[in-house]
Structures are given as C-alpha cells and as structure tokens.
C-alpha cells in the first residue's frame, strides 16, 4: 500500500497516511485563548486531484495566504456549508497516525496576545510596553495640553487626555470587531492581516472623517441648561463618563462580549444626570429610543442577513456553474452597495440629481473595477462558455428543491473554491470600508467628552457645541489602534467563531446586511446600534442554516451584557463623579 503525503491544517505539520484514499484532517485550533471548545479532529475524504501543486488562480483561491485562516481548510468549509457528505466516512485512527510535535507546540503556554498573533511572548510584551510609553509621553507634546497655562491646569489636562485615551483604547478593543470579526471568522483575512488593515483604516477614518464639532451633552440624552454655570461639576461628569464607559467596555472585552460603545456613553451620562441634575436632566424619550434599539437592531440585522444568505444559496449555489454565477453577482452587489452608501452617507451636493449622479457614477466605477479584478484573477476558468456535464457533476450537487427558502446543496471542489474566492474578496472590501467608517464615526464617543472637558479646563464656553482640535482627533485614532492591537482579538473571536461558524459567503451576507441596515435605518431616523445589528446579522446567517447552528450560550451571554450596559455605566458614572468631585475640591 503506497503511503499518501498530506499536510495538516494545523501549523503546516506533515504526516503520512497509509490509506487508499487521501484525507484532509480538520482541526479546530485554539487560536484565541478564551475559546473553550476542545481541539476537534475529524476527517473528510478528498480526491487526490483536488490538491494540485500549481493553483490555477493563486490570488483569489482561499488556500492562498490572502484567504487562509488557521481554523479550517477549504474542505471543512465545504462540509460546513451543507454540501453532501460521504455516507461511509473512514475516520483516521489517532493512535496509529500521531502528529510529531515540534517546538511550535509550546505556543499554548504563551499569553493571550502572543498566542493570538503567533508571536513570541517577548515580542508581545515589547509591543505593549511601546504602546504604553507612547500613551504616557505623547500628551506632553500636544497643543491641547494647554501650553502657557498653569501647572495645575496642565496636570488636569494630562489626566483628561489619558481618560480619553482609555475610552478610545476600549473602543478599539471591543468595537472594531464590527468591521473585522466576520472576515477573520470566515477565513477571508487572518487575524494579523485584519488587525494591520484595521489599524491603518481606523486611524485614517478618525483623522480624516472624525467630526470636528461635538455636543457637550452626548447623543441628546441630557438637558444642557441644567448644568449651565456648573463648570467644575460638568468637568467631573464628563471625565467620569469616559472612565465609567471605558471600565465597562474593558470588562466586556475581557469576556469577549460585543457591546455598544454608544450605549456605554449613554448609560454613563444618564447616571451622572440623574445623580447631579435630577429626573428632569434626562431626555427620557431619547433614552427610550436607545433602549428600543436592543430589539430593533438585531432583528433587522438577522432578517436581512437571512434573506441575503438564502439569496446567495438560491441563485449562486444552485446555478449550473456556481463560480461564474458568483463572479457575475459580485459587480451587482458592489454597485448596489457603493451606490447606496455614496448617496446616503457621502453626498457631495445637497441637490438630489447631483447626489444621485455622483452615487451612480461611483457605483458603476466600483462594479467595473471589481469585475476586472475578478476576471483577471480567475483567468480561463471563467472564460469557458459552458462546463461539461462531467465537470458539473463533479463540481456541484444537484438540487432537489427549488423554493427560495429551501435548503440547497452547494458547490464542491474547484467550484467551491471559486465561490469562496469571489465572496472572500468582496468581504475584505466591505470590511475595509466599515473599518474606515467606524474610525470616523465612533471615535466621537471618546473624543467628544474629552474635547468638551478640555474646553472647560482652558476657559472655553461650556455651551452645547465644542470644536475638536486635530491633535485630539489623532489622539483618539491612536487609542483605537492601540486597543485593537492589544485586546481586539477577544471580541473578534466572539463575532467570528463563537456565535456560528462562518465562511466567506456567510461572512459577506452578515457584513453586507449589517452595513445596509445601519446605513438606511440611520437615514430613516430609526434607533440603531451597529454592534447589535452585526451580532443579529451573524445570528441570521446561522438561522438560515438551522436553529441548531447558533450557539445559544454565546447569544445568551451577549444579550445579558447588552441589558446591563446602561445600568452598569450609570452606576459607575455616579461613583466616579463622586470621587472626581472630591479630588477636584482639593486641587482647584
């Protein structure tokens, strides 16, 4: 019997299998330190010709480094998608065929950050120390420190900048998973690629698109005139809101709970307003709208992602040539997404005809660009007019149902790789856009109260509008990048792996649905939360595969964390305000 040479999907270890068929073992490696599932080993019979030494389309195929994820191989994705499995599966005997351990196996002893990024513990410690040093030293060179003011004011400004950095750090650790979690979970990006990409885009978005005008009373939750003339109390309240929201975000990030940063700030503001301004200091109608988003956001996200994923399975997976169907659907999806986003979020003119023309032009340009890239990378595979019956029989599984919501068996082999390559590329594009937009939007949750507090310290008006300096915008962007680098992998693990198993098609469906819902619901004035919407969208993809494909314990933990976010933020804010007012009474 001739031994077959095979590469393991875990750390590229090689071993021999004395079988008549070639098998590709599946391992669920514990990339994330807080992942509780045991290492799972299964086997899936493959045909030897599928493992060709020369890939036909190296850039878009999921086995390439651009779309390789250490959780699973393409074969395990295929099985997870619902493709027809072999009825007589022969399991590999673990006692006969043991994998030789190498020095790389000592990774389990590394701390969380080192294990997540596959780096040494000394490198992880060096990165953390450098970030901490920069966080402590950079404020000394910022104009917003209050050059020319008294030493006491400079010390308070320094403490305020550190509080803003702490909040931004926790936003990066928790909220950036909204953009990159599904891409990592599906294998479209590795964790290291996702963090590096998000770091550049988050900082760019915060610096280039971050709002330059903010309200002292964030999100219209508090009545502004209640605190007119009470600058010291207002300063303490703003500082306590940053500290309280940051504390709860850090707790949530430690356990991998994706919570809304907006809700954290709202809860902190509500606690401060109730304790020091009374019941009349809170806009209760605005608070009710925020609470209603707990239900509206995940439901809308789940519904849209459910339909998008079913649409993909119905019109791409069931096509005679799924690869060509995916390549044809990609430009359409890009056109719809870019046109809608350009028209709703970035109109260059208030004139409806001009804004619509701009959106259509950008959508067309995006569709043409994506179509050219896909056609160029997939090459002759997509130029073939039709596939032979033998190829179709080998590449796809016949469908027995034709209903839109019916369960459809998907493609296999080369066709599956083409589909995943196309949707993986589209998912990376959508993740990049969401990351850039997130940096420009959510950085205000940290730098809004920060800029208002600095304005009070420097003798500015404590009115309703505060101008945000450019160095404060950059400071908030740096905080987001720092939090993403050190702790971002925790919530990414929850979004990408712990709710339901994701593939490029599922990840794209979830991300496309979440972005669409957030965009249009915001324009319609509906209360919406990007975090809640994305979690709901990931759940919707799981529901599309069956109720058993959603991990209920994870969903239960997430929902509980949502419910307690505002109360916990309020309690912490009251506590911190009391502490800060006592300290300020001695300093000022």
Model-assigned labels for residue ranges:
Residues 2-588:
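Alpha-helical transmembrane segments and immediately membrane-proximal extracytoplasmic
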